[in-house]
């Protein structure tokens, strides 16, 4: 399944979750797009709820179904809770950590920064958004990319960096000190439903 590249706001409204991280998509119209307005939502079946939760998380991180399922299977081989491990692995993606550093206003913009070669890991350029960063590794912006407007604009509005990243705003550099804990990850996601979906 291909990665969704359509209007992010419309998708956010359909899933009932902010994919931009700003929440603006749901402020005026907190219901799915379509001609029937706020009265069109119907009660979902158990399968429908599981599918919706899976789609929420997949689109939140901007992944294809194949990438998403592969990461899910990898999480199942780790000790501990499958669902929590899955979310922890998703959070360690390079494009996500660039977003968490505040270098991009959305994960989609962060993915483009990585794709276009603006990001380095331990001093080496990495252009694979799905690259899994390991604790202790350092993420930075290439010297010639530090004045990009997209980065400057994001830095002006993003001022929260999670505790598992130590960020130097002057150097545009962060160290991934540890994996995230479940309490630091999106509370609006019920990962147990995703485990149930793939366990059918």
From Swiss-Prot:
S4 RNA-binding domain mapped to chain residues: 92-152
What Pfam families has UniProt attached to this entry? Answer: Ribosomal_S4, S4
Q: Does the keyword rRNA-binding apply?
A: yes
- According to the UniProt record, where is the region Disordered? 22-42
Q: Name one GO biological process term.
A: translation
Q: Which SUPFAM superfamilies match?
A: Alpha-L RNA-binding motif
Q: Which family does it belong to?
A: Belongs to the universal ribosomal protein uS4 family.
Briefly state the protein's biological role: One of the primary rRNA binding proteins, it binds directly to 16S rRNA where it nucleates assembly of the body of the 30S subunit. With S5 and S12 plays an important role in translational accuracy.
Quote the subunit structure annotation.
Part of the 30S ribosomal subunit. Contacts protein S5. The interaction surface between S4 and S5 is involved in control of translational fidelity.
State the protein's name. Small ribosomal subunit protein uS4
Source species: Bacillus cytotoxicus (strain DSM 22905 / CIP 110041 / 391-98 / NVH 391-98)
